[in-house]
Every structure is written in structure tokens, then in C-alpha cells.
Amino acid sequence: MSHSFFNLFLISLFLYNNCIAHHYTFTVREVPYTKLCSTKAILTVNSQFPGPIIKVHKGDTIYVNVQNRASENITMHWHGVEQPRNPWSDGPEYITQCPIRPGSDFLYKVIFSIEDTTVWWHAHSSWTRATVHGLIFVYPRPPQILPFPKADHEVPIILGEWWKRDVREVVEEFVRTGGAPNVSDALTINGHPGFLYPCSKSDTFHLTVEKGKTYRIRMVNAAMNLPLFFAIANHSLTVVSADGHYIKPIKATYITISPGETLDMLLHADQDPERTYYMAARAYQSGNIDFNNSTTIGILSYTSSCKAKTSSFSGYYPTLPFYNDTSAAFGFFTKIKCLFSGQVPVQISRRIITTVSINLRMCPQNSCEGPNGSRLAASMNNISFVTPSHVDILKAYYYHIKGVYGTRFPEFPPLIFNFTAENQPLFLETPRLATEVKVIEFGQVVELVIQGTSLVGGGLDHPMHLHGFSFYVVGVGFGNYNISEEDPSSRYNLYDPPYKNTMTVPRNGWIAIRFVADNPGVWFMHCHLDRHQTWGMNVVFIVKNGREPNQQILPPPDDLPPCYE
């Protein structure tokens, strides 16, 4: 065999191996699980809770055949995956697709592009993501290498919430009554509540490590409604990635992680191997609302330890910040910096300013269970988003179907007031119900300022997630954003801001983010506290096609779930 032919053979083999499409099958069905002394049926993927881990290399394309064998509708979202030109597989129900109905299938095409580390997948239909979720491990494509030392082992950690009741009943009740949803009964680590909860001595996550080894923790906060503090006793964590992108390493004794966020952390097993160490997670909650203030516990022990590997109260417990310690929560958030500097767009094409608020809607005879007999709601720029119920927005946009949505989402708050004042006029609390989107030209550099308000209860934190893009968090602040300032960039970090897809707006504060609208399609933005999403704290961005063929939405798949008008 000639050298030239052999080299051509090797090149062809390399290209073939790098173009193989990976196929997965996700079968969604109800499976009984017992926790906290009671048994209930939960939605699962492949009968697993949490769901299976997907492993890809940067730039891969995978196909996931979702088979709905459950009794309710389902969709899947690939959180943190930008899906270039492919909104058809993004997943939010009635935003980019109609649901996969019981007995039906849909083949998702998931296109990875700029994602480097850990992202995740979850259901995106009602509150089905409570148990339908899992991690996605992204690896560098050779010859690329990691910008931090390679760990000896990888550890998936999914933080979540557990209700003893059927989650469908929880949702149906608070939607029907207009009140707040019942808080969860437990927090979980990889689905395990931990031994502090009833009937959970054997339902505790246990991590065994070897002295001198390094472990890469790939973590997501999959909780429905709670930002969380997390720590491991006597062990520091080196945070190396956030939301699928590398960051400047942060050495931390605790981390704060909001629903939807992912973190990669290096854990060095460098403590006394004869001791037992506990990991713990509990809520960060700055607002005046009911919440689950319990603590979930996991166990870390060393392989050489002679101690029994069972739950006990004799080990070392971590120190976590107090539940309402805002300085601790945002002290961690603001340490996150992009590993590579100088990439944030300096000049912007468009500035959009929106408020995010909790609201009230009046009920006849004050018959609802919100404050003063009202119905709780939520809004962006005083519009409480109404999700379509028959045709999804992407289909309506692509096929020019009228009457599904409007295009009048305001670029500026419709009313200017002291957004963070202690006492607000009652008339400000009532939102407008509508399905309004914001249309953006391809290639525009968008600055989006999100301002929290103190309406109804004094304000809350809001982890805001944008589909289809990662964005630079160029500013974070407390109080009112100066909306009259012509050029606020002098107060921004335009050097190494974090590059994320989910960022928390502080209670009675604001964030400023920037992104380039170079991904045509229909893209959802919403609060990742699911009660707020259910109440309407959402908006849709439609990014128009560019001029070139590679700047236009891909054609729809043949097996897209049908809509029923």
C-alpha cells in the first residue's frame, strides 16, 4: 500500500469517526418510587431517576428518539445547547413544538457547537422536569485539551426537589386556586433525600473517594423553585466551568447555584481518610415567602477508611451560609469570570429594558387564594405571558399563521416608577395578559437589562434562562438601574464577564446581558423558578433569518408532533 493511499485512508477514517451521529432512545414512562415513607408513580426516562447521562464531544450532533409511553404530554429541552438554526428541537411546549402525546414519538436532532463542559436536558412541558432530567457531559474534541488538570474520576451531582404528592396535583391545585404552590417535602442529591428526612437512612447519596485523587464534579441545580447553597465539609472546591463554558478557576468553601445552572468543580481528596465528611445543600431564599428550609445530606468517605459506610451523625458537617444571606449568594455569583477575555461585544445595536415582577390579578368576589383573594401572576414589562394552547409559536412564525402571537413586546417598561421602593401603588400590581414576542434582526448585538421590582411581597430573585444563546453578563447591581443613562458601559465589565445561559436577577436589583443575535429562530426566555414561569414571567425572541443560506432556519423535521387547532 502506497504512503499516499495509506494517508488518505487514515484521513478518511478520521473524518468518518468524527462524523458518526450518536443515537439515543429516551422512553418516558411512569415508574413507582418510594421516598419519605410513601410510594408514588413518577415520570422517568428509561425507568431511571435521575435520567441517563449523555456524553458527547464538542461539536457533535446527536439524535434522541423520545418515546412517550406515559399518560401525559411531554417535550424535551437541551438546556445550554444553542442548537444553531435548529429551533425545531429546542423543546419548550407550544413555543417551538406541540407536545409529544401519549403513545407518540419524536426524534430530536441536538446540534452541539460552542458548548465546552457540562450542560443538561430536561422535560419542558408543565412541571414534568421535576423528575425528567439528566446531565450532558461535553468533552474536548481532540486535539483540544482541557484548560485545567484532568481529574482522575467524574462525579455527576444533580440537586433537586421531591414532593410526596403527585407533582401534577401540585400544579393543578395552584393554577386552579390562584395561590402559591405547596413547597416540596425534601431536597435531594442525585434523587436521594438523605438521612435527615424520615425513612431515608438508606436513601442517602454516598461518594467514596481515594486519598490523593482528584474528582471532577459535574453539577446542575434541577430544583423547581429554589436556588441552593452547597458545600462539602473540610474540602474546598475549585470551580472551573459555569453553564457549559470555562471560567477563571475559583477556589470556594461553598457554592451558590440557581435552578438551571451547571457548574464543574474539582474536588481534591486531601483530608484524613479515617474520617467521614458530609456534603449538604439547602435553599437560598431572600424573599418573604414560604419555602423548603430543610437540608439534604450526602456522605463522602475514603476507600481506606475503616469506619462503617452508613449514615451517622458522627462525621464533619459543612458550614453553609444562612438561608437569606444575599451577600454570600451574590458574592459567589460575581466571582465567576470568563476564562478568555476580550470577546464581549463592545458596541451594541439595540438596548431592551424589561422589568420582572410578581403580580396580582383580581378574582370575582375575591375568591382566589392569593393575597386578599386575588390570583398570583408574574410578568415581564407588565405583560403576563399567555402560552398558546393549539399551535406553537415557531410553527405560526414559519408558516405565517395569524392570530397566535403579537409582536408588541415593549422595549422599555410601560410605566416608570421606583421599581424597588418598599411601598408600591396597588394599580401597578395588575399585569396585561398577552402572547407578545420581540422580533430581532439577524446579527444585531442586543443588550438586555432585566430589572427586578418589589411588587407583591417586596421582590424576589429570578434566575433568567435564554434558549438558543449564551450571553455575557456585563453588569449586576442592586436597586434601580439608571435607565436614563445614555452610556452605562463605564460601569460594566467588558473585559472578562461570565458567559452563561442562566443568570439570577437579584432581589430588587438588575442584570445587564449582551448577546449577538446570530441564531435564527424562535427562542424562549423565562424565569427558571417554575412557579414564576407558570404565572407568566416569560418572553419569546424571534431572530429573523440572515441573507446567507447558513444564516437561515433549517427546514422542519418530517415527524414534528402535530398540533390540534
Curated annotation (Swiss-Prot):
Keyword Oxidoreductase: yes
Catalytic EC class: oxidoreductase
SUPFAM superfamilies in alphabetical order: Cupredoxins
Gene Ontology molecular-function annotations: copper ion binding; hydroquinone:oxygen oxidoreductase activity
The organism's place on the tree of life at top rank: Eukaryota
Signal sequence bounds: 1-21
Binding residues annotated for Cu cation 3, in chain numbering: 124, 467, 526
Keyword Secreted: yes
Variant or mutagenesis effect after changing residue 509 to D: In tt10-1; transparent testa
UniProt-annotated location(s): Secreted, Extracellular space, Apoplast
Glycosylation sites: 73, 182, 234, 293, 324, 372, 382, 418, 482
NCBIfam families in the record: laccase
Protein's name according to its UniProt entry: Laccase-15
Species this protein is from: Arabidopsis thaliana
Encoding gene, per UniProt annotation: TT10
